[in-house]
Amino acid sequence: MPKICILGSGSWGTAQALLLSSKEFQVILWGRIEDGVDSLQQDRENRRFLPGIRLSDTIVATSDLARALKGADIVVMAVPSQSLREVLEKARPYLGKDSCLVNTAKGLEISSGMRMSQVVEDVLGKQSRERYAVLSGPSHAEEVARNIPTAITVASYHKENAFLVQDLYMTPFFRVYTNPDVAGVELGGALKNIIALGTGIASGLGYGDNTQAALLTRGLHEIIRMGEAMGGEARTFSGLSGIGDLVVTCSSRHSRNRQAGILIGQGYSLEETLKQIAMVVEGAHTIRVVHRLACQLRIDMPICTACYNVLYANRKARDEVDDLMRRQKKHEIEEIVKRKKGW
């Protein structure tokens, strides 16, 4: 029976603890704030992030990193993307050399522009690549914790790791597919948050379903362009970790990025919005990296650029939407036009 350590006691870390403990695995849930972890351990409930859901008695919650990682066969990283490096550096002395590393964070590191697998390799060394996997897809913690049917993707450089994680997580309510495209799966999870901010902004401005559908669809084109430039496979973005996660993040009431966008569209500043959400909004960080990379690589990302301008360049959201609608006319899918000779 494997021992599983989950780093991160937020909503997603807690939901994964519930899922894995339902299979009678030994699960330790680590959180950095001692008072919060003590409350989890004593009350058997994550009142801040998943109120009303009882934790299994077999889940052990602790703020002691050494205790959490001791003897762990599987280490699940469920901390915010901007915290991953710091947590890994603290965890490194206690990590087993053969532990499988499962990342569930969705973002890009602001300072380096790295994907999460690259951050892991940078901190733990190249050998960590051999045991790394990323789990991503449309999986709001609020639904996973309540056993609402969910499907998701695991990617790894080595199929044995992917199969291991697939078997680990599969339940009658949680289906896991495998994919060898680590970069694509990571990028789909990171980039969709920007588009969700955009659809939220449109909703906050009072625009309807047509506008949001257009932003989602054209946003997918931007995700594919940037994703391919950063090493992902185009087909991956048509899967669960791509369009699947994009759809749920752009449309769900559980989506922090969409909710943040709505508030910004209603006129709140980014600072006011983040304070009101009171949880990590990954898209607000990822957009800074993507805007920088788009400029460096000269990749056309009009929706992402518009969102960046609203969040960080003091532009009015309605003006950015107007500018998007007035862009130079073009074909919808250039690749099809190129194949149609004489069109």
Curated annotation (Swiss-Prot):
Residues annotated to bind NADPH: 11-12, 32, 106, 141, 256, 280, 282
GO molecular function, one term: NAD binding
Group of enzyme by EC: oxidoreductase
Keyword NAD: yes
Protein name: Glycerol-3-phosphate dehydrogenase [NAD(P)+]
EC number from the UniProt entry: 1.1.1.94
Active site: 192
Subcellular location: Cytoplasm
Residues annotated as binding sn-glycerol 3-phosphate: 106, 137, 139, 192, 245, 255-257
GO CC entries: cytosol
SUPFAM superfamilies xref list: 6-phosphogluconate dehydrogenase C-terminal domain-like, NAD(P)-binding Rossmann-fold domains
PROSITE patterns: NAD_G3PDH
Gene Ontology biological process terms from the UniProt entry: carbohydrate metabolic process; glycerol-3-phosphate biosynthetic process; glycerol-3-phosphate catabolic process; glycerophospholipid metabolic process; phospholipid biosynthetic process
UniProt record similarity statement: Belongs to the NAD-dependent glycerol-3-phosphate dehydrogenase family.
InterPro entries per UniProt: 6-PGluconate_DH-like_C_sf, 6PGD_dom2, G3P_DH_NAD-dep, G3P_DH_NAD-dep_C, G3P_DH_NAD-dep_N, NAD(P)-bd_dom_sf
Pathway stated in the Swiss-Prot or TrEMBL entry: Membrane lipid metabolism; glycerophospholipid metabolism
Catalysed reaction, written as an equation: sn-glycerol 3-phosphate + NAD(+) = dihydroxyacetone phosphate + NADH + H(+); sn-glycerol 3-phosphate + NADP(+) = dihydroxyacetone phosphate + NADPH + H(+)
